Every structure is written in C-alpha cells, then in structure tokens.
Amino acid sequence: MTDFRTLDDAGPLQGKRVLLRVDLNVPMEGGRVTDATRIERVVPTIREIADAGGRVILLAHFGRPKGKPDPKDSLKPILSTLSEKLGRPVAFGEDCVGEAAASAVAALKDGDVILLENTRYHAGEEKNDPDFAKALAANGDIYVNEAFSAAHRAHASTEALARLLPAYAGRLMQAELDALTKGLEAPARPVIAIVGGAKVSTKIDLLENLVAKVDMLVIGGGMANTFLHAQGKDVGKSLCEKDLAETAKRILAAAKEKNCTIILPVDALVAREFRANAENETVPVDAVPSDAMILDVGASSIATIDGAIEEARTLVWNGPLGAFELTPFDTGTVAVAQHAARRTKAGQLVSVAGGGDTVAALNHAGVGEDFSYVSTAGGAFLEWLEGKELPGVEALRAQG
C-alpha cells in the first residue's frame, strides 16, 4: 500500500469537511434495503472520521438514472438503514451540488454525517466532467475514496474529484488494495487461481492475464466445457461456446509457454435436467452421454484441485465450479471452498476471492468469513485481475 495515501496520512480531521465516496448500491425491494452488506462495510470509516471531529459528507451513486433526477433511484430510502447501522443520525441533502448541497453542508457540526443525493442525477458524473467535479469539491476540504467497487470507472466522484482535493484511501479501499497486492502483485508462491462461471467469452482477458501471473490455474464451471471441447471431448448438451475453441487453445498454449499448470475437470457430475436433485451420475469427461449436461466437477476433480491447493501458498478465486445454486451440483464448489478455508485458518494459505457469484458461493459453503479477503467489488475486482489500471485507484496513487 506504499503507493497510496490513507487516512493515516490525512492529519487532524477536526472541523474538516470530508467528502467520503462510498458504494451504497444495495439491493432494495419495496423501498427497503434487502442486503445491507455494502452499508455495513463502510460504517467503520464513517465512524472513524466522525469520531475524530470530521464532518462526513457521503457521496454515492444509485442505479442508472441517466443524468437526471428519478425518484426510484433516490438515496433517501437508504437513510434509515444507514443511520441504524451507524448508530447515529444521518442528515440528507436533496442534491449533491449547488445551493441545496452547500446549505446542508454548512449546517454540519463537527462529528456530523450527511448523505447527499445520487451523484448520477447529473450527467457530469459519468462523463467525468471537470466542472461537475469542481462543484462537488466546493463542499469539501479533503476527499476519501471508500468505493473500490466503483474504481474501475473514471467518473467525476471517483476520478476527477480526487485530483482537486487532498485524496486518501478509506479503510475498506485500503484493505481491498492490500488484499489484491497480496493476491497477485506480490504474492507468496506458488499461486493458484480458480476461475469458474458460465462463459469463457466474459473472461478471456482475465485468463490471459492469469496464465502469465499464476503457477496453477483451475478452470471450472460452464467455461471448462469450452476447453474440454477444444481438446476434442464431447460435452453432450452442456453449456459450451464452441466458437471459442481456438481462443481456448490459444490460452492453453500461452499457459504452457509461461509454465502455468492448467487444471481441467477429469470427471463430471452430469444430469439430463437443469434442476435441483435431478437424477445424476459421475462420469469421466471423455464419456459424457450425448443427452446429458455437465453441472459440476466430479470427486476425482475435487481431489485434484484440493491437492493443488495443498501445494499453494496463495489462492485467487473468481467464479463457481458448478451450478452451485442447485443441490447436489454445489458439491464441488462447497468442498473446494471448505478445503481452502481450512488451509487459510491454519495460516497456510492467503485466499482472496471476489465477484458476485463467488461471494454467494462462498457464503453458501459457509466460509465467507474464513477467507483472507472476500471482495464485494464485482467489475473492479475483475478488471484488477485482468491487469487493467483502475482510474479511481490511479487518482489516489498520483498524489502518493
């Protein structure tokens, strides 16, 4: 983390107006928050700044209101949950810039917290407009970015604003950057990556970057079928992007050149129906019945993956190994996740995981708390794994 300034570098916060960019893009139903994870994760930083006498001004986006106010994308319904989790009142500003924001911020006392309305109510936000960023900056003395999940987008509140005020990484951002550095940039070796999920097409850049950086790469989920097909195996009615066979071959060749061991399933749990508890059998991957589909890795594959994890000192995981939302096709994902969690708890493995399905799969396996770090930042986590620069992170680095 030496490249980034954190709250430790910000000096006394007493009386300072702190523009804190957070991710409050939480799922809502009927005007109520259904999963408060993202709110809970930013509470410690809000509390730390407020307890130090800072005036906390929360900036966030919600939904996709297309650059103009839309009541369904208002942040106001989040206020009660935010206040409850924080254990103190939170004021609300009807706009994030202009007179409404200025007067609301002017009324703050040391230690107060205010949430300003959706930054995406203004077209300048997604355009990274310098004038809009200046209007945001007018209400703050320093800027703290706590929204790693939005760091892959060069928006006014994540990028341009960070260049107008003294800028720092919040505690959550700091933890995320620390974890990712340990996972890929300066890892303890050997490093194993597990990449699953349905499609190769969405993860080509990711796979190409990983084969150059990791020692072992496990390919699972629906995307493994494309690789098996590329090797000339019949995958029956399984999900398979046959038009990407050449891409799969290219990735396999690149892995060989970089001395990255590719681990593909050797056996599979197959069924004729895509539903929970469908009649199933375990078969070798070169004997998949033509009317069946692969829905999980088999016992021999699990043993191979577990053995590889035994050798590794670092694990990076993105995507499930099978259709984990349907029993018993969650067996592979659950078994491997629990094995990785045991190694992590024993201090033998640094485990970093991220991506929506991955977080859900680890929670389903009951090990969401046992990995070294689980990132809630879907797109930003993927782009980091792809080796891309993240504008919101680079803006913090530039001042470091």
Swiss-Prot record:
<dbReference type="InterPro" id="IPR001576">
    <property type="entry name" value="Phosphoglycerate_kinase"/>
</dbReference>
<feature type="binding site">
    <location>
        <position position="325"/>
    </location>
    <ligand>
        <name>ATP</name>
    </ligand>
</feature>
<comment type="subunit">
    <text>Monomer.</text>
</comment>
<keyword id="KW-0963">Cytoplasm</keyword>
<comment type="similarity">
    <text>Belongs to the phosphoglycerate kinase family.</text>
</comment>
<feature type="binding site">
    <location>
        <begin position="23"/>
        <end position="25"/>
    </location>
    <ligand>
        <name>substrate</name>
    </ligand>
</feature>
<feature type="binding site">
    <location>
        <begin position="61"/>
        <end position="64"/>
    </location>
    <ligand>
        <name>substrate</name>
    </ligand>
</feature>
<keyword id="KW-0808">Transferase</keyword>
<feature type="binding site">
    <location>
        <position position="38"/>
    </location>
    <ligand>
        <name>substrate</name>
    </ligand>
</feature>
<feature type="binding site">
    <location>
        <begin position="355"/>
        <end position="358"/>
    </location>
    <ligand>
        <name>ATP</name>
    </ligand>
</feature>
<dbReference type="InterPro" id="IPR015911">
    <property type="entry name" value="Phosphoglycerate_kinase_CS"/>
</dbReference>
<comment type="pathway">
    <text>Carbohydrate degradation; glycolysis; pyruvate from D-glyceraldehyde 3-phosphate: step 2/5.</text>
</comment>
<dbReference type="GO" id="GO:0004618">
    <property type="term" value="F:phosphoglycerate kinase activity"/>
</dbReference>
<keyword id="KW-0324">Glycolysis</keyword>
<dbReference type="GO" id="GO:0005524">
    <property type="term" value="F:ATP binding"/>
</dbReference>
<feature type="binding site">
    <location>
        <position position="203"/>
    </location>
    <ligand>
        <name>ATP</name>
    </ligand>
</feature>
<dbReference type="Pfam" id="PF00162">
    <property type="entry name" value="PGK"/>
</dbReference>
<keyword id="KW-0547">Nucleotide-binding</keyword>
<dbReference type="GO" id="GO:0043531">
    <property type="term" value="F:ADP binding"/>
</dbReference>
<dbReference type="InterPro" id="IPR036043">
    <property type="entry name" value="Phosphoglycerate_kinase_sf"/>
</dbReference>
<feature type="binding site">
    <location>
        <position position="120"/>
    </location>
    <ligand>
        <name>substrate</name>
    </ligand>
</feature>
<keyword id="KW-0418">Kinase</keyword>
<dbReference type="InterPro" id="IPR015824">
    <property type="entry name" value="Phosphoglycerate_kinase_N"/>
</dbReference>
<feature type="binding site">
    <location>
        <position position="153"/>
    </location>
    <ligand>
        <name>substrate</name>
    </ligand>
</feature>
<dbReference type="GO" id="GO:0006094">
    <property type="term" value="P:gluconeogenesis"/>
</dbReference>
<dbReference type="GO" id="GO:0006096">
    <property type="term" value="P:glycolytic process"/>
</dbReference>
<keyword id="KW-0067">ATP-binding</keyword>
<protein>
    <recommendedName>
        <fullName>Phosphoglycerate kinase</fullName>
        <ecNumber>2.7.2.3</ecNumber>
    </recommendedName>
</protein>
<dbReference type="GO" id="GO:0005829">
    <property type="term" value="C:cytosol"/>
</dbReference>
